[in-house]
Amino acid sequence: MFFYQRFSNQSFEEEYTKCLDGQIDGVIIVPVDLETTRQFTNKLHERSIPFVLLDSYMPDLRPLSFFGQDSFCSGFFAARMLMLIANEDKQIMLMKQMKDGRVTSKQQANREVGFRHYMHDHFPSTEIVELQLPFNGTRAEYDAALKAFFEEHPQIHNGISLNSRAHIVGDWLLRNNRRDIQIMGYDM
């Protein structure tokens, strides 16, 4: 079994190199990103070694199979659930964690597509206001960003995080006694 540091392309490459040096009959991969994972899967295809993907579906890599959620449908459903409580809101918050100018996972990106699709079809007049937080930010950075966001958008009372970091917002809300804002998230 080989483990890599999540969100580290270098760590992923080091581990897949070790994997390819061994005698393997098949591989189960939790992808890092499309292009880095493609480097590995191209080598697996060259050697006729089958592989399956966990968590992130990347059909372009031609896996034997995929195990995980349908992220588009998940985001679509999340929007539907959020709007049960926010159906009269003019604006809602979409908290995104960013690394190098993009969201940190393919699943999060696909959830957002599903989320926005539902909102476009069912709540086209509700504005989605993004709050972008750095992936490896400090508590002080998060606190400053959240304070500024809610001062700039006092009418926002509902929000969502399409990753497992809703606790960052929830923690800030608790510490600042902001009981007028609800946050929904994944993998809590």
Predicted regions and their residues:
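Short hydrophobic segments within beta-strands
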Residues: L54, L94-Q97, I160
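Hydrophobic alpha-helical
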Residues: S11-C19, G26-H45, E127-M188
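Short, ordered loop/turn segments at secondary-structure junctions
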Residues: V32, S56-M58, Q97
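Flexible loop/hinge segments that line or gate small-molecule binding clefts
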Residues: T36-C73
